[in-house]
C-alpha cells in the first residue's frame, strides 16, 4: 500500500494518504475533494454548479472547509466558510475493486455540523470492505433560504447532496467503489435528508439502499413554516427594510457571510423558543422553466404514490430520543398541527386526556420526555414505515436502538441526567458506527466493543447485499425479519439482539387511532404497481398565478396493469379514513387503486404549508370519494371545496419544542 496514493477523477488527479484503523488495518484517505464549484459571489443561494478541473495533482490529505455556521458544539463560535462543497472518500482498496459505497449525510438541524472525522471517523466501517463517503453541504440560509423565485427557489443544501451523488456516480469507481451499489444513510436532519433524497427526482435513481436514522421527511420540523417570512426576518435583523424579494435578495447576496450566519443563528434560536421550528430547512419548491427542483410537491404525496426509490430501507430510532420537556403546560400543544384539532375543542381536550393517561400516569419527567420523543421522531417513523410498506415491494428493516454503554454520546455530553433518563438518546447509536474524537479518552467495556462490532456488521451487511443479517454468527445471533403486512417486525438493539413486533404498541396504537380519525388519506393499494411510463403534466405559472405554458414529462418506471381516471362529480360520497393496522375501533378500509393525500388545514396559515405558498387553507379537512364495484376511485369531491380546486400538495406543520435544546437536554 503506497504512502502517497494518487487517483484520477474527471477533474484531475488527487493525492491522498494512508490511514490506520484502531485494529491496525490500513486504508486510503482522500479528503477535501471539491464536488462542485465554490458557491461564492453570484452563486450564493443558488443550486451547485459542476466542479472546475485542475491541472496539477491536487492535495487531498486534509479536510475541506465546513459550511459557515455557528457551532453549537463549541461555545457557539462562528466557524467554517462559504466555500464548503467538499467530500471525503475512505476506501480499503483503489485498484481493481468494485466495493459497496456508503454515503453519510450528517445531522445538525440543517444549521450546524459537518462530515469531518472529529465526529464521523470512518475506520470501523471501512474495515468491513466498504467505501465510506462523508459530505459537507451548505447549512442555514446559505443552504435553505427560499424566496420562491427562479433565482432562489430553495433547497440549495439538498441540491448540494444531489450534486455529491452525481459526482460519486461518475467518479467513485476511481476509489474502488461501485456506483451501482450506493447506500445513503443519515441521522436526525441527515435522516430527513436521506428520505428526501429517495423521493427527489434528482437523486432517487442514484440510490441503491437507504438507512434512515432518527428523522424522516414526515417530521414537522423537517420543513420551513414560512420561507418568505424567514427571509424578511433575517434581512430585517441585519438592517434591511425591503419587503420585496428582489430587494431582500440584493441585500442578503452582498451581506458578509459571518454577519449572515450569526444573524440567522440568533433568528433561529428565537424561532425555536416562539414556534418550535427550524427556521432554514427544506421547502416544497415552486416549479419554474429551466430550474431543477429537489422537491416540488409534498413528500407525503410522493411517498404514498410510490414515486420513491424502489430500494431496500433500514429505518429506526433510539429508545428515548429527547429529554427536554415541552415548555407549554397544556398537553394539547403536543398534538400535531396536521391533525387539524383546534386548541380548546372537545376533540383536542379528549386527545389531551388520553395523553395524560398514556404518558403521565407514572414518573412525569420520563413521561414528558417520552411524549416529546414520540411527537418529534417516533410517531412519524412509525407512520413512514407503514406508508413505505404500501409504496414499495422492497424489504424494510425496522430497528430500535436501546443500548446504554460507555460509548453512548449522551453520557459524555450530559453526565448529570436523572437516572430514569439515562437511556439511549438522540444520536447515541452514532458512536457505535463512527470513531469520534470526543470519545477518544473513553475506555469501552467488552460489551461496548461487542455492540460496536454488531452495529457495524449490520450496517455494512445491509450496504453490501440489502440484508443486515444474511448469516447468523457470534455477533448476529438473530435473523432480522423485514416488516410485512401482517407483522411490524423490529430488531431491538440492546445488550442482546431481540426480534420484537410492533414496538411501543400501546402508544403507537393511540396515535394510529388519532390519525385515522383526523388525518384523512385514501387507502393505499395492497401492492403498488407502477406504470411503465407516467406522463406528468407540469404547469409553468406567471407571477400572477396564471398558467402560461404546459409541458409533459415522461418518467420510466415498471409495468402497469391498467389505467385509471379520476372525474370530478357530486354524487353521495363515502369517507375513507387513513388506514391503521389491526385497530378494532377503526373500520376496515377498502383498497383503492390510486393514492391521493389530503391534510387537514383548518385554521392553518397559508405560510404553514411546508413552504408551499401556492396552496390556500381549505375550509374542510375531508376527502370524500365514491368507488366503482372493482374498488377503484370513480368520482372525487371534497366537502365544501370548489370542484376546480386541485389536489393538495402539502402536509400540516406541527409546532414543537426547541429542537436543539431537546438534543442538549437543557431545562
Model-derived features with residue positions:
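Short amphipathic alpha-helical interaction elements and helix-loop-helix interfaces
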Residues: 93, 131, 174, 178, ...
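Serine-hydrolase-like catalytic core of hydrolytic proteins
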Residues: 74-245, 249, 303-326
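Non-catalytic accessory segments of hydrolases
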Residues: 1-158, 179, 284, 322, ...
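Eukaryotic intrinsically disordered, low-complexity regions enriched in proline and serine/threonine
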Residues: 529-667
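Substrate-gating cap/lid region and adjacent catalytic-acid/histidine neighborhood
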Residues: 254, 258-449, 458, 465
